[in-house]
């Protein structure tokens, strides 16, 4: 992947990211990725009574990274753990999203996540905006139309191609609520992937 490589450490899969965000796909990701570098400000935290020391990024870094990462999965794999990550951060630090985050569609998505924290997790974070997409985000988490790891539930060449095409268009439509990304580029990226790995064209797993 142009974004990250994978390796295993003691049997645990690890993603070694080249960038914090997917700057190769989303136009908004590039300036947000640069902002994350300025927000990093790691500080040392002692664990287990001081036996271990780890460095953690600033709350502002985590606020932007966690919410943007969740947005990248909108329509294609957003899960309850994305909401819980945001809820834990809100509970610890409150609303600490950097003031430099001004994109209205991204802010609407973050507000929608926050509304769900209030409704589902009994939190009380003041938030305004994002109401029109709250139910969409909820359905994506709890009842995804195209589960990312659910495989292809149809058989036959035509049925598989039709299912995958509908899934691609659906994912694009969902992510277009937040990001500017060309449909034709998404289609071209899919074509290139399948040309490189022809066996994946009709793969159902």
Question: Across the structure, where does each feature detected by a protein language model lie?
Answer:
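Conserved NTP-donor binding/palm subdomain of two-metal-ion nucleotidyltransferases/polymerases, i.e.
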Residues: 1-205
